[in-house]
Swiss-Prot record:
Gene: rsmG
GO MF term set: rRNA (guanine-N7-)-methyltransferase activity
Alphabetized Pfam families for the sequence: GidB
GO CC term (a single one): cytosol
Organism: Sphingopyxis alaskensis (strain DSM 13593 / LMG 18877 / RB2256)
Major subcellular site: cytoplasm
Record InterPro entries: rRNA_ssu_MeTfrase_G (IPR003682), SAM-dependent_MTases_sf (IPR029063)
Name of protein: Ribosomal RNA small subunit methyltransferase G
This protein's UniProt keywords: Cytoplasm, Methyltransferase, rRNA processing, S-adenosyl-L-methionine, Transferase
Chemical reaction(s) catalysed: guanosine(527) in 16S rRNA + S-adenosyl-L-methionine = N(7)-methylguanosine(527) in 16S rRNA + S-adenosyl-L-homocysteine
Its job: Specifically methylates the N7 position of guanine in position 527 of 16S rRNA.
Sites where the protein binds S-adenosyl-L-methionine: 96, 101, 146-147, 160
Documented EC number(s): 2.1.1.170
Length: 233
């Protein structure tokens, strides 16, 4: 199991008994953590149906994970929202959103304005189809590489599978403010990747245990990051 590291030295581990190991546990945790309305449950169910159908046309998620889609993808995404419980309506930017994980799950469970950044056309077509089908008026899809997305202050930045950690942070630093919350699932390499960051960046983050995988961690941080200085051309 990942051993979480906090800047304040406190514990934040998830016990083996609390891990969401199956679909029933995942649904139960979603109910307990977010108390979704009937409409939200219907939206999540519809999203799952659309995701599975689209996965037969383009590779959005590993086919082997479909039988456990509620634990492996829905609860796995929703746990990021549980790590940012601050009140308010600040912009949430989801980088490399792919099939909308975690962005669309977060958007269904909250009213936070959501920007899904994805450069691949077919994935963006799917994202737009889901947004329209579920009437998620607070969600915007940016079909472009991150480097071409206009700078906007983000209350939250997430990235489930986007780029190596140092590059991810450097590319997205311009969206950060003093209060930005960073939520970066990094799998089994979370502690190792954190240790490789520049010292000032390391101090901003700690590792939270994933609720869906005993070997995975989520980097959680708060604050503004200055982009790396570029050499002159």
């Amino acid at each position: 199991m990942i051993i979480p590291h906090r800047a304040d030295g406190g514990k934040n581990d998830v016990s083996a008994a609390e891990l969401l190991k199956d679909e029933r546990a995942a649904r139960g945790w979603l109910t307990q953590a977010f108390a979704p309305s009937t409409e939200q449950w219907a939206q999540i169910e519809r999203f799952v149906t659309m995701l599975i159908a689209e996965n037969a046309k383009q590779n959005l998620i590993a086919a082997s994970t479909i039988p456990a889609i509620w634990a492996r993808h829905i609860a796995d995404s929703a746990q990021l929202l549980a790590l940012d419980t601050r009140e308010g309506e600040g912009l949430w930017i989801d980088l490399g959103s792919g099939p909308g994980l975690p962005g669309l799950v977060v958007a269904i469970l909250s009213e936070r304005p959501m920007l899904l950044v994805e450069s691949r056309r077919r994935r963006c077509d799917f994202l737009r189809a889901v947004v329209a089908e579920l009437a998620l008026d607070h969600v915007e899809v940016a079909e472009a590489p991150l480097e071409r997305v206009a700078t906007r202050p983000a209350a939250t930045i997430s990235a489930r599978a986007f780029a190596p950690l140092d590059r991810l942070i450097d590319l997205s630093a311009r969206f950060s403010t003093e209060s930005t919350r960073w939520l970066l699932p990094k799998g089994r390499n979370a502690v190792k990747e954190l240790a490789l960051l520049p010292e000032p960046w390391q101090r901003m983050f700690h590792v939270e245990q994933s609720r869906t995988d005993a070997e995975s961690g989520i980097l959680v941080g708060t604050g503004r990051i200055a982009p790396k200085k570029r050499g002159k051309a």
